[in-house]
């Protein structure tokens, strides 16, 4: 019978298991107590011979439930990747012998512990069912990329090369993002000696020529609903027209904006037109187009330029950015080369507190700047003032430990990036206060208006945008889980995820595209989007036991649970990551 359950239990003797455990006794327990139909032992279950033994039982004996008593379920997933069977892993290596003393006194307890793991594995596999294919999402291979900058374009091109249709939504009237307004970029290829062309024009041409990529300019996503494999997004234009598209996964590459340098009056911004930020210098360089860069105030050629690093960032002062934006130091080196490459006699001085050169070739590019005559001064700038025929920069030289003044025709502030990450759903609009005090305040003054702008406009129970990490970046974890957000099937790439330069944004976008493809392919197969531990199943909800307390809808960290019209939990299995938070919050699930 096709529906007949036939369990096979396989016990490994490798990695010291055979020496530490009585595998014959474990086999007997699997057969008698675990009711396994087939029980076999092998010296090295994960090698080709052991895998072939299991596959033979699946093909010839009809085994459809497999218990592997060996190592952790996080190990050897490729070896034990059997199709169309339920697999339970009894962790005898990491969970038993590696955590138990290897002595005669502990041997009996170790054996009992291993026996319990075998019992649990046999019991678990009985109730495991293969995930069902989601027919609704089976044909949805489309990817939505929100943002048409370097990260967004790279993600779209990489996904299109893999054969997936892509839709780009860009709020401005052209592709390229901030990179479209840069004269040159930090080099991406050896010998990392000179600034390179941004390559934006080539990427735009490649996208326009690719029939798998659709571009919506002057557009935003005004509504996003659904789950991996079956997202639905309303794309609205400035004219008011709206189209609805269906997508398997979403990449959020909304980029970053420049810090508002007008908050730095002590550094002269807004007081003198000759004090600009890095974006302002890029504009001057593009206007010069390889010729002499001229200062905005009177159009004279710049003879001396000072770059002020960490302007308004890496600071605990109110209104400043507390973090490093990653690209600013090398961007200043690049911009100093604009002057040196045009005229080596121009005096270029970069005042820094700490010079940071991340990424491949960053140190080489920094040394190239030194070779071209760029001056680097370790110091902290206190004031930039205009007077006479130029600017005066007052700073403390941290090497000489004394206050110094320097003159300049032009001052460039390295002001940093702020992620375009939308509404932070984890932050309340107003401060939490005692109810009585709040009522008094309402009668006296109106609540302050908080202007927010959503990027995705999600219809999730938990809010319209992605939860943020520290400082507004919306990754789940920079190192352990890159690209992943707390909204399954939605991945972030580029400077909205963490501070980075153009080369890093391209690499980032490629990774996000691969993760998005993985999510939609798993959704087509009815699998969870994050099968790291080999578990492809989902929790089951008993509606008859629900008291409508809403704890599960609120506490799910991934927004997997909404509410239906009757106010019962509406479980979106494709959003679930099987963390078990809902099961802990409600024991009757």
Task: Place the predicted regions along the sequence by residue.
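Residues forming the flavin
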Residues: 2-587
């Amino acid at each position: 019978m096709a529906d007949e359950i036939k369990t096979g239990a396989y016990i490994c003797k490798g990695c010291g298991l055979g020496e530490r455990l009585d595998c014959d006794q474990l086999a007997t327990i699997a057969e008698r107590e675990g009711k396994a139909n087939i029980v076999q032992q092998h010296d090295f279950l994960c090698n080709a011979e052991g895998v072939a033994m299991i596959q033979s039982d699946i093909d010839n004996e009809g085994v459809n439930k497999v218990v592997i008593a060996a190592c952790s379920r996080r190990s050897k997933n490729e070896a034990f990747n059997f199709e169309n069977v339920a697999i339970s892993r009894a962790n005898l290596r990491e969970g038993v012998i590696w955590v138990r003393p290897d002595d005669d006194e502990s041997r009996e307890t170790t054996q009992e512990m291993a026996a319990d793991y075998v019992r649990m594995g046999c019991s678990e596999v009985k109730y495991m069912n293969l995930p069902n294919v989601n027919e609704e999402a089976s044909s949805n291979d489309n990817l939505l990329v929100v943002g048409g900058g370097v990260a967004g374009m790279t993600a779209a091109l990489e996904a299109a090369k893999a054969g997936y249709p892509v839709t780009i939504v860009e709020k401005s009237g052209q592709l390229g993002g901030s990179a479209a307004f840069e004269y040159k970029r930090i080099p991406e290829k050896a010998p990392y000696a000179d600034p390179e062309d941004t390559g934006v024009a080539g990427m735009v041409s490649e996208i326009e020529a690719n029939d798998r990529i659709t571009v919506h300019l002057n557009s935003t996503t005004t509504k996003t609903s659904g789950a991996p494999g079956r997202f639905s997004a309303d794309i609205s234009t400035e004219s008011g027209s709206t189209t609805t598209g269906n997508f398997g996964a979403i990449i959020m590459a909304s980029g970053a904006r420049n810090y508002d340098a007008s908050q730095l009056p002590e550094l002269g911004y807004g007081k003198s037109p000759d004090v600009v930020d890095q974006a302002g210098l890029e504009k001057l360089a593009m206007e010069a187009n390889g010729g002499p860069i001229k200062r905005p105030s009177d159009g004279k050629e710049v003879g001396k330029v000072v770059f002020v690093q960490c302007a308004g960032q890496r600071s605990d002062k109110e209104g400043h950015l507390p973090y490093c934006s990653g690209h600013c130091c090398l961007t200043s080196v690049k911009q100093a080369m604009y002057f040196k490459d045009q005229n080596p006699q121009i005096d270029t001085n970069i005042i820094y507190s700490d010079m940071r050169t991340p990424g491949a070739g960053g140190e080489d590019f920094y040394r190239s700047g030194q070779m071209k005559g760029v001056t680097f001064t370790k110091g902290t700038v206190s004031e930039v003032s205009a007077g006479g025929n130029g600017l005066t920069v007052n700073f403390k030289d941290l090497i000489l430990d004394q206050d110094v003044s320097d003159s300049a025709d032009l001052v460039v502030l390295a002001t940093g990036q702020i992620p375009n990450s939308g509404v932070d759903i984890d932050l309340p609009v107003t401060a939490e206060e005692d109810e009585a005090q709040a009522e008094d305040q309402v009668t006296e003054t109106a609540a302050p208006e908080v202007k927010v702008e959503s990027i995705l406009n999600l219809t999730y129970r938990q809010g319209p945008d992605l939860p943020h990490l520290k400082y507004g970046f919306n990754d789940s974890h920079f190192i352990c889980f890159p690209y992943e957000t707390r909204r399954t099937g939605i991945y972030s790439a580029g400077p909205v995820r963490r501070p980075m330069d153009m080369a890093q944004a391209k690499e980032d976008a490629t990774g996000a595209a691969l993760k998005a493809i993985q999510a939609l392919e798993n959704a087509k197969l009815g699998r969870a989007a994050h099968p790291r531990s080999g578990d492809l199943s989902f929790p089951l909800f008993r509606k008859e036991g629900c008291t409508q307390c809403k704890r599960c809808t609120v506490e799910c960290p991934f927004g997997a649970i909404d509410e239906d019209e009757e106010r019962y939990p509406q479980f979106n299995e494709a959003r679930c990551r099987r963390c078990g938070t809902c099961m802990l919050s409600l024991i009757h699930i």
